[in-house]
Amino acid sequence: MLKEAIQYLVSLKENKTYQLNGEIYSDRELVRVAPHVDRPGEVRVNGLDSIVKLVSHELDMLENLPVYIRVVSPRQVEVFSTLDSVMGRDDLYVAVCDAPDFAAGKWMPHENAIIALRSAFVPNEGTEYLLDLLSRISKEDGVTTEDNGVSQTVSARQGIALKRFEQVRQRIALRPYRTFTEVEQPESEFILRLNEDAEIALIEADGGRWKMDSKAAVAAYFEEKLAGEIQDGRVVVMM
């Protein structure tokens, strides 16, 4: 009796297959055990120059070539290897831009707008115009804004007022810091809005074109810095 029980328990460990109507069935689910593969840990940095140095110094240590540099967004770059023998990739490096991201489209108090224009934008004619405009806005008992969708005028009545009546430019070319500082910040147009609380808003008006321009600039940076590695086929840059 004990012998039969032991034999029964042993039989439970066996995987049995059955053929029914030309198909093979198993009486238990099989789970594939993937082979262990040593892979490097992903390195996170904040600059494009760091990616160039890592690729230049460690490329000869890698077996699975080429290495792909993918510009994911204006603020992120990923580097990974090609497929290996078990169809896996090594995630090597990630660069994430740590420059402050300008909050386009949000209302900013008068003082905050001045600080943002001086710290979060590359100086150009557009920032000069806005700083001059804001310097001539004063608190009053009230204000009236007239807006026909094309232009806006501000006059004193309640909230804020320009020290003299004038028409405000609606579309202004600006270059906020929106991508890695190693490349030129893209210029794009913004729509300027003013309200009765002395707040301003800058709304992107280029349909997101600046994102493609930024990614192209980042890709061009790598193509210049890693020209030799790209030419011999060990590095591929893509967007």
What residues fall within each predicted segment?
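Long, compositionally biased interface segments
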Residues: V183-Q185, L192-M239
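Charge-rich, solvent-exposed alpha-helical interaction surfaces
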Residues: A5-Y8, L54, A116, Y221, ...
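Membrane-inserting effector segments that mediate pore formation, membrane fusion
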Residues: F102-V154
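Amphipathic, membrane-active segments
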Residues: R44, L48-R70, Q76-F102, V143-I200
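Surface-exposed polar/charged interaction patches
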Residues: L12-N15, P40, L54-M61, L65, ...
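Amphipathic alpha-helical interaction segments
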Residues: K16, S26, V33, Q76, ...
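Intrinsic-disorder-associated interaction segments
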Residues: L2, E23-S26, V37-R44, L48, ...
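An N-terminally focused, membrane-permeabilizing/fusogenic/translocator signature enriched
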Residues: M1-E78, D232-M239
